[in-house]
Each structure stands twice: as structure tokens, then as C-alpha cells.
């Protein structure tokens, strides 16, 4: 008589589950991978996440962001690639850092010498409780969008826009020409 184990199909629920969000943007996409801690009755900013200390922008492995084309984040140019997001929260503004160590575990190995860019954004206080940390994309257009971070009663907006607009415009024009060429070929086959 055999015994079959199904345990390999299940995992324990994580206290801070991973979330991956991807947004089609311009001629490519942006992906954010982060751990989603919850408030669970705790005071978050200023206590669990102290003011003035580097935070991994999530739980467990540092939050990462991937760009498949050059962009401007917070008004600063960033090459395509993978970056860790680190934040130094303050009561009225946050310092946002994109760091080259995209595989960092937490903020323990944070090295400011690996920073690609650094900028500040204002903190927006909200009326409604955001129980679990949430990253999202809002105000999307062909040329810009905002990466939103919400947790507890706090929200910040990180502006992202295409870099080197004239190059992207040329790529889009060439793609349109290729599509027209394909349509013309299909018409000749009939």
C-alpha cells in the first residue's frame, strides 16, 4: 500500500507575500517586485519604519524595479536595467534611491556607493488606511506615469517619464512604417 504526499503543492502563507506588477509603458515596460507587509495594528512610519533610516521599501528582499528602456525617474536619467529601491522616510518628504544592487536582501547590505540616482518626493497624508503596502501605476500616458507607494496613512508619487523623447518618437515612427508595410504585403496576397 503506497502513500502519496501532496505537501509539495502547498506552502505556508507568508506574513509579507511577494507582489509583482508590470506596466506597459512607451515602447517597453516597467516591472516592480516587492514584499507586502501589513500594518496589523502597528504604527508604521516613525516607529516600525523609523524616520531618517534607510528602508528596503517593502519586506524581505529589497524592492526591485526594472526598466526596459532609458527613463527619467524623479527628473533624473536612468539607464535600462534592474535597480533596488531604497527609501529614507521623513515626516514630510522621502528620499528615494535607485541602487544598482537589485538583488539586495533588505537594507542590511545597502551601499550608498552603488546608488544610481537619489531624489526627494513630498509625503501625502491620506484619510483611509492602506493595510498592506501597495505599489501601483497611475496617471499613465505615452510619455509619463507615476509610481505610487501607499501604506498606512501615507502616499507618495514618483514621476517616471521617457528619456530621450526624440529617439522614442523615431522608434514609434519606424514601427508604424513596418506595420503599414505588413498591411501592404497582406493586401497584395489577396
Which residues make up each language-model segment?
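Mid-length scaffold segments of soluble, non-membrane domains
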Residues: 56-110
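Sec/Tat signal peptide C-region and signal peptidase I cleavage site
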Residues: 3-7
Amino acid at each position: 500500500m503506497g502513500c502519496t504526499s501532496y505537501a509539495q503543492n502547498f506552502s505556508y502563507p507568508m506574513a509579507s507575500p511577494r507582489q509583482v506588477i508590470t506596466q506597459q509603458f512607451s515602447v517597453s515596460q516597467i516591472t516592480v517586485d516587492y514584499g507586502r507587509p501589513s500594518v496589523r495594528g502597528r504604527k508604521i512610519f516613525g516607529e516600525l519604519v523609523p524616520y531618517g533610516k534607510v528602508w528596503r521599501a517593502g519586506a524581505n528582499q529589497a524592492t526591485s524595479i526594472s526598466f526596459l528602456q532609458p527613463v527619467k525617474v524623479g527628473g533624473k536619467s536612468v539607464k535600462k536595467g534592474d535597480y533596488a529601491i531604497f527609501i529614507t522616510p521623513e515626516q514630510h518628504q522621502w528620499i528615494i534611491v535607485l541602487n544598482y544592487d537589485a538583488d539586495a536582501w533588505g537594507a542590511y547590505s545597502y551601499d550608498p556607493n552603488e546608488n544610481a540616482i537619489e531624489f526627494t518626493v513630498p509625503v501625502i497624508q491620506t484619510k483611509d488606511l492602506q493595510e498592506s503596502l501597495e505599489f501601483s501605476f497611475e496617471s499613465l500616458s505615452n510619455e509619463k506615469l507615476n509610481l505610487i507607494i501607499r501604506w498606512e496613512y501615507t502616499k507618495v508619487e514618483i514621476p517616471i517619464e521617457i528619456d530621450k523623447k526624440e529617439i522614442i518618437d523615431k522608434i514609434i515612427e519606424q514601427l508604424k512604417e513596418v506595420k503599414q508595410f505588413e498591411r501592404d504585403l497582406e493586401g497584395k496576397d489577396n
